[in-house]
Amino acid sequence: MSWLVAEIDGPLVLTRAIHFGASAATAGVLIFRGLVAEPALRAAPKGSAIVRSRLTGLAWALLVISATSGLIWLALQTMSIAGLGLNEAIRSGAMWTVLDETQFGLVAEIRAALAVLLAGCLLLDRFVLPRRLALLAALGLVGALAWTGHAGSTLGELGDLHLAADVLHLSAASAWIGGLIGLPVLFAVARHSSFEWGSLQSDAVRRFSTIGVASVAVLIGSGFVIAWILVGSFRALLVTDYGQLLMLKIAVFATMVGFAAVNRLWLTPRLAMAAKSGEDRRALSALRRNTLIELVLAFAIFIMVGVLGTLHPAIHLVH
């Protein structure tokens, strides 16, 4: 893999990885809150309020990381386009030119507006409507990332298909990652609560497991479409830097699916049975460990996404 020793723009790759990860996690935490935590904890209003508060705080932190890394990404992108240093890029007004005259800039402005809307909704989080609007804004924030990558430069009907696949891919990834972040929060609250949460935790895990299965199915389907557009052939997958890194990404994703399968087929039933007997410690410990491993693997994938976004698609390199 020559990309390992090539001159990769490390700061840009890392910034993209952090930004993609934080944006996806922001949406994912809100998905987890709305579709998993709140329905599962209806029988424990006090505990539900604590979990919702912590998840909202986590969404705030992730939104700040997303906004900060987005500004850094804009600066790095301006430096790359204009061939300027950081000080010159800021003082010369080149960043405003990028914002006003490029697709990247237009998408950045739209996403900034969505981030402001999301922040406003989080401030009014005690009301139902802002909570729902926050989820939509967060999904828009992560979905619009599709227009910053290769999909944004694919033309015609194929471009529409590419964008749709990218949006689905990003949304499904967000839902999965949100659960990986949200479950430990729920477990931490349960561990320090006097309320008997065994059955409620089991219900939350079951709900997230269902979302996880759907997310994996969407990731595989949309990923196949994206690979068909950007790679095009098995030979291109094997002989190009893009294809080889994509194979590594697929291998890491398959490992994540393996851990998710263990959680779904083994640990979730164990947790449900243990909840009835009150002996769920071992199942919870294994689930927490697997969740942490999946999060580490997810960040590794975002690093690869950061690199892939800087490489020429394989289909353009093999004839």
What are these regions (language model features)?
Residues 1-319:
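Polytopic transmembrane helical bundles with strong interfacial aromatic enrichment
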